[in-house]
Amino acid sequence: MWSCRVISASAIHTRCMNELTIDAVREIEQIHSKWIEYEVAEDDHSLMALCADDIELWPPDAQPRLGRAAVSAQIARGMTRIHSIEITDRRIRGSDEIAYLIASYRTTFSSSEDSTPGRALGSHLWILQKRTGKWAVTLVSWSVWGHADISSPLTGS
């Protein structure tokens, strides 16, 4: 029988990524939902409380931000006001120590330069690790498939 500890980093055995308990999946779903709630509310402090000290933020159009201080500074500098985030196709896989979450999103936002609401459509990838009995976000990466004014229908929905 294969063990996750025996498998090399270059070849993840699929059985190792199907060991999350229902409770762990629910906990991760709750963390994801809270993140979105805090992001919309601009509650940076609560959002950062969900993160590990070695959090990594990998935006699609900028250099990665590594560590709590850099990620916190990036989030605080936000020039965009998020009005809502809709999540679809959320999937969570992992083991009892590490998990990943992938989902599609549709975000309604406005910028400090232009108050006209716009939309972004894309996907994001999260990696979470269980540390001292609690799940913590260790990496967030996302892609943007398209942008549109709120009055324009966005394809791919």
What are these model-derived regions, one by one?
Residues V6, H13-A49, E56-S157:
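A beta-strand edge to alpha-helix "cap/lid" segment located at domain peripheries
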